[in-house]
Amino acid sequence: TAISSSIERYQRSKETTNYRAFIDAAQPRRRDFFRRLNEVPGATFELVSMRRDLLSLLAENPELGVLDIDLRELFISWFNRGFLVLRPIDWTSPAHILEKIISYEAVHEISSWEDLRRRLAPPDRRCFAFFHPSMPEEPLIFVEVALCAELPSSVQDILSDGREPTPEKEIEYAVFYSISNCQQGLAGISFGHSLIKTVVAELSQERPKLKHFITLSPVPNFARWLARHNIQDGPD
């Protein structure tokens, strides 16, 4: 095969041209096809949606796994941190974006527009999302943050109705209480740690007096990252 021949040539002589020939032989042609498709406006979202549908078929059609690998490898490149844009989400954000926040919330269900308002409108509540320039109307992942005077004992303290906003001068804690991935077609591509680290930097710059950053939302391996950066991990 072309791959075997290119490997043999490279093993005999590790020249750049032989390495390039091996890469070209090993690269599935369909990846070039997907790259060309992605040049069409709006195609990125359609390809992400296609992988979402593909993932639902893998259990009964394992032979499609090679196609999933190709799409995942392309998405890892296309959606790397350098391309992502952090945007704050608040009560004045466009309605279609707010509707998606309601729909995509995966940790603590948003039961109504009033429930969403309680999470976004008060001055001691923040929400941040990553977007991609090719999908500007589709959040990739978002995190909800409560700014508190003391460590809350549970998420119910944060979401309770009728509470009074924390006075600005008393805020010492930033509590990350919910983080939600939005695009099923990007499953297996990690955004959570990058989002948290970026938001920590954003809030630290915005509010230098913030002393503690904690999480009440399960983020894989997040506790280890918190420990490395001397940030407190709160109770579940």
Regions found by a protein language model. Name each.
Residues 1-236:
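Extended, composition-driven regions rather than compact fold-specific motifs
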